[in-house]
Amino acid sequence: MCGVARKPLTVSGNRVLAGGSAASFSGNSLFWSNNGCGGDKFYNANTIGWLKADWKSDLVRAAMGVKERGGYLEDPVGNKAKVKAVVDAAIANDMYVIIDWHTHNAEDYRSEAIAFFREMARMYGKYPHIIYEIYNEPLRISWSGVIKPYAEAVIGAIRAIDPDNLIIVGTPYWSQNVDEASRDPITAYKNIAYTLHFYAGTHKQSLRDKAQTALDNNVALFVTEWGSVDCSGDGAVNAAETWAWVNLMKTNGISNANWALNDKREGASALSFGASGNGGWGSEQLTVSGALAREIVRSWGGDTPPPPPPCSAVSFPGVVEVEAYSQMPKVQLRVETAAIGETGEPPIQCHSKQSPPSVGRGQ
């Protein structure tokens, strides 16, 4: 594998820093690794290399399914091999990589999680590229009574081998109730962040308010999944809410991974059905959500810039030639009090998840 270039990630207050400096990163989450679910064809070096070169992705998430059909409990050797292929490729391409214990019931498989993460820590703990995500999405269970004790046990096992790399912990209610976790954070170990998931078609200002509460309580957040559609993993893209979330993440230095690099016939899939499992996708092979995700990931950068400015009005006489570059969902030009396009043309537009079968995406 290539030499180390990525800076180590550390937590300071409510920020995840890279090499001690403010930073945030954007990239892709793969679909469930489970045998036969379809998304596992993307668990290879060609896909990871393409994401780095074409999407400019700084991170990738290997979502290793645990209990569902074809997952780790049924085939540990096969699923670990897929994860290792992604991790090796990410390190070779100098990307951060999230090793995700992808289940809604991790507390039922504590010993298995400990054994798995011990193996990953022994194998990869020396690389600063590594991020451990020890619980994907807890359901309607207690943070203090269930999730936190599980997390502390798994974190302890990892820290005995890898004392430094970032560990991300899932939060109650499909990793939405970050405010609950922030009121009783894990204090026995350093470099801990908390999982926040959002799907812009469903999750709007009320969830952003929970995120702000957690930040105000001085815990660091990491969005290991986000989608521009609704929480089922399907539905239409909500561009306006997606950009509102981008603004929150950039303003607060929150790194993120888009769900999902897959070609399943659903709104959250970045690729059209039948796309190659080895990269090389043209624009015609991107879905609407995939094109938006690629735009966001490519324009992210490795630092934390100021948020984009709000809409503003400028008025002056004369002829104007305009080019618009914006992270806002819409730009509108007006003549006097009328918007150009109100008589027939639309206003100028700057911008144009689902689990294996039988498993719901969540709330």
Placement of each model-derived feature along the sequence:
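Acidic/histidine-rich helix-loop elements
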Residues: 23-47, 66-77, 231-234, 278-281
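Aromatic-lined substrate-binding rim segments of carbohydrate-active enzymes
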Residues: 41-105, 109-119, 156-162, 238-253
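A mature extracytoplasmic/lumenal domain signature
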Residues: 29, 64-66, 103, 136, ...
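A residue-level signal for beta-strand positions that form part of recognition/binding surfaces
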Residues: 8, 22-25, 191-193, 318-324
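N-terminal carbohydrate-binding accessory modules
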Residues: 1-59, 295, 299, 304-313
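Short, solvent-exposed loop/turn elements at domain surfaces
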Residues: 17-18, 24-26, 33-39, 69, ...
